[in-house]
Amino acid sequence: MKKDIETEADIKLLVDTFYDSVNQDELLSPVFNDFAQVDWQHHLPIMYRFWSTVLFGSMAYKGQPFPKHLPLPVDRQHFSRWIALFTQTLADLFEGPRATEAKQKAAGIAHIFQMRLGLIGQS
């Protein structure tokens, strides 16, 4: 049986493993590495704080994630792949209530971003 997401080290493992997958993905990697030219040493700690805030209520993340995504050349297919990779990463590493919550939160974030980008209608 896998363990649930319980510690900051678990958040780091989740984020690092997920973005390793993103960097190997033929659809998502160009968005992050070619278009956005993400500085991973800067970006990953932000993502650790973001998911710590989302899952643990740590309030470590201070920011507005949506505006940074506005200029990205993404469509529904990108969001579907992002969710698929995130969900697979969670399934590979964790199970339990907090892992389930992470899947639900990620799906909700993706849905809101797609609505705000005009990729889907409100439902």
Show where each model-derived region lies:
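Core of compact, soluble alpha-helical bundle domains
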Residues: 1-123
